[in-house]
Curated annotation (Swiss-Prot):
Gene: RPL18A
Cross-link Glycyl lysine isopeptide (Lys-Gly) (interchain with G-Cter in SUMO2), sequence positions: K11, K128, K170
GO cellular component terms, semicolon-separated: cytoplasm; ribonucleoprotein complex; ribosome
Oligomer and partners: Component of the large ribosomal subunit. Binds IPO9 with high affinity.
Lineage: Eukaryota, Metazoa, Chordata, Craniata, Vertebrata
Name the record gives this protein: Large ribosomal subunit protein eL20
Amino acid sequence: MKASGTLREYKVVGRCLPTPKSPAPPLYRMRIFAPNHVVAKSRFWYFVSQLKKMKKSSGEIVYCGQVFEKSPLRVKNFGIWLRYDSRSGTHNMYREYRDLTTAGAVTQCYRDMGARHRARAHSIQVMKVEEMAAARCRRPAVKQFHDSRIRFPLPHRVLRRQHKPRFSAKRPNTFF
């Protein structure tokens, strides 16, 4: 999978094709993060074939739809449980991100894993994504923003006063 652009969250439901032996086969639902619905269906078959004796030629996709965020204007904390294949083996990992949407947090995770661990998108498997309360967060990079009186420095302020002389004898100091 190529994690191009912002990933989207898809709900994919599939099953084995009905046979005389099992006329109503069980449905399997997955939450897939992919750039488009074609890749989402492909990832579904990849994961389902690992978990069950089921493949694309002997199955069907019942539903594939994009899941939209309930509150995309509120900043939330997300915990992501994943496994990835590195050059030395397979590792489990837990990561935390702050974002407006679940898909945004997962996209951030893919970018971060590529940058920090050189993990390609095809070798990352997101197992669980959960919205976390501020009290449950563990990573200091996320916890540093849990302050109601948070203040940010203004390192480079340019004062543009209207009636100030156009030319000055000395350069202005804009770093306070």
